[in-house]
């Protein structure tokens, strides 16, 4: 318990330093997520790469005033779809999304949090309830996969084993376009 508290505190401080260290972090809020980004161009690129596939028809232009609204809508839509695919509906679901400007930035954050190297372009850090995405490698399946990790963490009182988490996240990614 003490180790978990130390790790959570350390991760939170790292995240704050990361976000603050990159100048003026901007944020938008959706129903479920607080979305953090450093520059408008990152949000625009994230939005362009965050293609909804067959769900694109749901983007009614009269309901969307700009890129921020579109990102909010897409985020909430995919969270709802993932919850439905997994048949898991956690109460008071809230999480953070950090939009990083490159895969290198993702890898630096991962190393700061976990003290390990990786080649991930996205990951979910349950200790700080944050999904990290690179604007350079956004696919709907990746978004669904990471959101599935977040939904499961919020749903279960005791998180399932890593292999079960991964299996269900892959299931959500595979079925996001059904």
Where is each model-derived feature located?
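Active-site recognition of the HExxH zinc-binding catalytic motif
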Residues: 141-154, 166, 170
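Bacterial N-terminal signal peptides
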Residues: 11-20
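Acidic/histidine-rich, surface-exposed loop or edge segments in extracytoplasmic proteins
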Residues: 29-67, 151
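Bacterial N-terminal signal peptides that target proteins for export
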Residues: 1-11
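Post-HExxH zinc-binding segment in Zn-dependent metallohydrolases
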Residues: 159-178
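Auxiliary, metal-adjacent structural segments of Zn-dependent hydrolase domains
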Residues: 65-127, 137
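Boundary at the C-terminal end of the N-terminal hydrophobic targeting segment
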Residues: 23-25
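Short pre-active-site segment immediately N-terminal to the catalytic Zn-binding motif
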Residues: 126-144, 156-160
């Amino acid at each position: 318990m003490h180790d978990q508290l130390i790790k959570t505190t350390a991760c939170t401080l790292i995240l704050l330093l990361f976000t603050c260290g990159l100048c003026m972090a901007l944020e938008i809020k959706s129903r479920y997520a607080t979305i953090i980004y450093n520059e408008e161009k990152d949000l625009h690129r994230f939005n362009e790469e965050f293609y909804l596939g067959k769900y694109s028809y749901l983007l009614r232009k009269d309901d969307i005033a700009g890129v921020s609204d579109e990102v909010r809508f897409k985020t909430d839509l995919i969270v709802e779809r993932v919850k439905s695919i997994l048949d898991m509906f956690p109460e008071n679901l809230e999480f953070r999304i950090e939009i990083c400007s490159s895969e290198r930035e993702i890898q630096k954050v991962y190393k700061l949090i976990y003290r390990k190297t990786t080649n991930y372009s996205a990951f979910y850090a349950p200790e700080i309830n944050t999904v990290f995405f690179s604007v350079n490698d956004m696919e709907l399946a990746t978004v669904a996969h990471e959101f599935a990790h977040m939904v499961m963490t919020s749903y279960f009182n005791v998180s399932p084993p890593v292999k079960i988490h991964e299996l269900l996240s892959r299931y959500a990614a595979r079925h996001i376009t059904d």
